[in-house]
Amino acid sequence: KDCGEPAYLALRQQHWNCEFETSFIPHFCKESDCAGIAMVQSNENHLRAECYPQDSGVKLVVSLCKDGEDSCLAQMDLPAALPIKLKLRVEGLVASVLYQSNSEWKPVISDIDLRSLSTEHAGGFVGCTLGLYASGNGEDAGGYSDFERMTYRELPTN
């Protein structure tokens, strides 16, 4: 949503059912710094799973931007363990965001309606991208994040 200068490294979504996963270590300096993953159709229509600094560690916020309006779908405190591991699972027009704790993937939120990211709703012809995201949210970012890896894979169709 940051129309300033967010960092976004992405791959085009190539499969109806897929997973995008990353592992990263944030080095936040300001409260406005964030890092995570995103599924982007446009600046006005996208899904973000962002980690923000807080005194006790990291807060994960999942937001859906539809027609330029953000809505917070979920937020939770993450364990202080590093690196942070996030996954976005897409099955058709439904998504889930997960995080890894003690080698186990746990859901943050499931059944996210992605119809607002479709070309039928949002226009365009390219579709969506899935990628690594970092931003200062309109401020000069004081920190950075070390993204260790990103993985995209097709999920089997049921």
Predicted regions and their residues:
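Extracellular glycan-recognition regions
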Residues: 1-158
